């Protein structure tokens, strides 16, 4: 999924760049050395997994020539968002490896960071939309729209989400620039704030619009989803279509839990950065903790983009069924000596949890 920044260097000189001449807390230099040495390799590995995994997920959703239902539309868009985000990771890895030197020029500085910023919002807004769709299907099944209307609503919602992500990333596209940082002897891709008030605006945008409000909606929807599942467990076993709905809901609940686990530490560190900027907290410990924390929690958030395909395969029984459908379509007719039912039985045994 998306990250707010590759490198942040504000006009006030508060940054994620390591301050070389400042007095560091014990162990900070070693922590920065470890970051420059180990993190780029890990990011490249995550990039590879994210690209391959999300391409596979999209192929499973889009190759079969049939209409996707509402839940599948949202999940396909989430995979597309993760895929676009993963494309920006090699730039971040190379920047860390070079000690925060940006060798790719100003246009890519704006484009790469703008796309990553947009996908931060797109990913969490999609998780909200997915949770809301399950909420309507399970908590208000009678009032839930017909399948066709739900599909159209899902398509329109995804268009609005991608548009909102693009609009919220406009300041990044406009303000990002490559500037010389004499203290580090590098030309860094930085985000200089034109006014001190921008620090507050950025915090509202990132932590409130990009996390707290969506988090409240996600918790609300999923609390009621879990309550509905507990109250209707017996009914779901006998109702036509119940097992399919339950499988989809289990997959989505897992995606939501992993998403929050990966992204919450980053937003905590981003808020601490704001507190440092306004001098609400001070001191060597908080500066080093926040600067290093933003880098490492960025990496932890990156893991989400390659974990989602793994969740689809190992927790999503419905997704595995779609893989079987794709396999059945692509299977050469010459191999029909084994009965279709037998091949499906073998395939299901292979994927059994």
UniProtKB/Swiss-Prot annotation:
SUPFAM superfamilies: Family A G protein-coupled receptor-like (SSF81321). Glycans are attached at residues 13, 21, 185. A lipid is attached at residue 330 (S-palmitoyl cysteine). GO terms for biological process: cyclooxygenase pathway; G protein-coupled receptor signaling pathway; inflammatory response; response to mechanical stimulus; smooth muscle relaxation of the bladder outlet. Residues 1-41, 94-110, 176-207, 273-295 are extracellular. It holds the Pfam family 7tm_1. This is a receptor for bradykinin. Could be a factor in chronic pain and inflammation. This is B1 bradykinin receptor. It comes from Sus scrofa.
């Amino acid at each position: 999924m998306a990250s707010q920044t590759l490198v942040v260097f504000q006009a006030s000189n508060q940054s994620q760049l390591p301050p070389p001449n400042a007095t560091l807390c014990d162990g900070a230099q070693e922590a920065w050395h470890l970051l420059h040495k180990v993190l780029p390799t890990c990011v490249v590995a995550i990039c590879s997994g994210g690209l391959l995994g999300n391409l596979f997920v999209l192929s499973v959703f889009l190759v079969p020539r049939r209409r996707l239902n509402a839940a599948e539309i949202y999940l396909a868009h989430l995979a597309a968002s993760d895929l676009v985000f993963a494309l920006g990771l090699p730039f971040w890895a190379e920047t860390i490896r070079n000690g925060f030197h940006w060798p790719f020029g100003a246009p890519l500085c704006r484009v790469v960071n703008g796309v990553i910023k947009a996908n931060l919002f797109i990913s969490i807004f999609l998780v909200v939309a997915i949770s809301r769709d399950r909420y309507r299907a399970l908590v208000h099944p009678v009032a839930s729209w017909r399948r066709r209307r739900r599909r159209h609503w899902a398509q329109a919602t995804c268009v609005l989400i991608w548009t909102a992500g693009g609009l919220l990333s406009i300041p990044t596209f406009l303000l990002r620039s490559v500037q010389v940082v004499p203290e580090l002897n590098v030309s860094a891709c930085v985000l200089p704030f034109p006014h001190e008030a921008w620090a507050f605006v950025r915090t509202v945008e990132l932590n409130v619009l990009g996390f707290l409000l969506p988090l409240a909606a996600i918790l609300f929807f999923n609390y009621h989803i879990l309550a509905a599942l507990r109250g209707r467990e017996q009914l779901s076993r006998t109702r036509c279509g119940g097992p399919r709905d339950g499988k989809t809901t289990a997959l989505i609940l897992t995606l939501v839990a992993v998403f929050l686990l990966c992204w919450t530490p980053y937003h905590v560190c981003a808020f601490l950065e704001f507190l440092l900027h306004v001098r609400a907290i001070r001191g060597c410990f908080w500066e080093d903790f926040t600067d290093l924390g933003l880098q490492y929690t960025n990496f932890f958030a990156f893991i989400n983009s390659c974990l989602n395909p793994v969740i689809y395969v190992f927790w999503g029984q419905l997704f595995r069924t779609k893989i079987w459908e794709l396999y059945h379509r692509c299977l050469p007719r010459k191999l029909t000596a084994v009965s279709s039912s037998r091949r499906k039985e073998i395939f299901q045994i292979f994927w059994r949890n």
